[in-house]
């Protein structure tokens, strides 16, 4: 059985930067979960997506890391949406369905850009164990921001948001997996999303994974939305409004995640977008 795939870079306007993604735009009927896991492990990208159903108003897909299936993830969302729209398989405004539910997506083919609207945020409690988080990041407790709290917020997945004193300190951070596991277990977060505000509309972030086999992620759209809510709700980085998160430089894959977070009733409308480039294609022989 031949299964076509595309190689995609998301959250970048430059090929071979951003976060890598493998997209299977038309998954054969009856293709098993075990085969999807095998192909995700074969690519060894942070995520591989399988489009399993197309319908007039959208499509359904599944997302796999080399270790697990995810209910939702950011760069697979914009990368898959752009790939399908660029090939005429879907419209430029459509609904993507995953295990999490429906996610509206918009594609700008001329610009090579895509946006997703994430779920309305749910705020978790603030987390005060600075010691374990500092250890997880290879830092000292005093390197964390002295005034801003750590907090879990979810718009689909739930990162522990970790404000760092400044950009220089953030660049010094080094992931220590055992402490990452302890920090996520204690806080209820699914990863650590460290960030430093550099100015209005300008934020640097790094994602340290605890359990998904990713290590340090070049671009994390599922964490960018919660960070946007954190910033907007506190009036940081010139938000509410628009901002850009720079991520991935420390792992050689510079990425830029665009935020547009604005009040919506008593909650927030959370949009995350970025550039997408299709850089290759091929066939799995299964």
Predicted regions and their residues:
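Active-site proximal loop and beta-alpha junction motif in alpha/beta enzyme cores
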Residues: 1-72, 78-286
């Amino acid at each position: 059985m031949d299964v076509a795939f595309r190689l995609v870079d998301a959250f970048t306007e430059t090929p071979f930067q951003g976060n890598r993604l493998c997209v299977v735009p038309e998954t054969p009927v009856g293709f098993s979960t075990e085969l999807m896991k095998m192909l995700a492990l074969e690519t060894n990208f942070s995520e591989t997506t399988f489009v399993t159903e197309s319908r007039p108003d959208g499509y359904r897909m599944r997302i796999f890391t080399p270790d697990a299936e995810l209910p939702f993830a950011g760069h697979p969302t914009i990368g898959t949406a752009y790939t399908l729209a660029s090939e005429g398989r879907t419209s430029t405004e459509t609904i993507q369905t995953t295990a999490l539910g429906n996610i509206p997506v918009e594609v700008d083919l001329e610009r090579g850009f895509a946006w997703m609207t994430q779920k309305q945020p749910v705020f978790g409690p603030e987390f005060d164990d600075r010691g374990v988080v500092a250890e997880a990041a290879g830092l000292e407790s005093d390197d964390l921001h002295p005034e801003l709290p750590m907090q879990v917020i979810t718009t689909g997945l739930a990162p522990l948001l970790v404000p760092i004193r400044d950009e220089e300190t953030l660049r010094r951070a080094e992931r220590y997996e055992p402490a990452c596991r302890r920090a996520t277990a204690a806080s209820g977060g699914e990863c650590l999303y460290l960030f430093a505000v550099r100015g209005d509309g300008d934020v640097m972030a790094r994602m340290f994974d605890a359990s998904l086999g990713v290590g340090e992620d070049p671009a994390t759209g599922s964490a960018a939305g919660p960070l946007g809510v954190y910033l907007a709700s506190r009036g940081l980085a010139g938000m509410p409004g628009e901002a850009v998160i720079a991520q991935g430089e420390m792992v050689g894959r510079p990425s830029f995640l665009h935020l547009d977070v604005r009040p919506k009733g008593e909650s927030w409308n959370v949009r995350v977008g970025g550039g997408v480039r299709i850089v290759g294609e091929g066939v799995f022989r299964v």
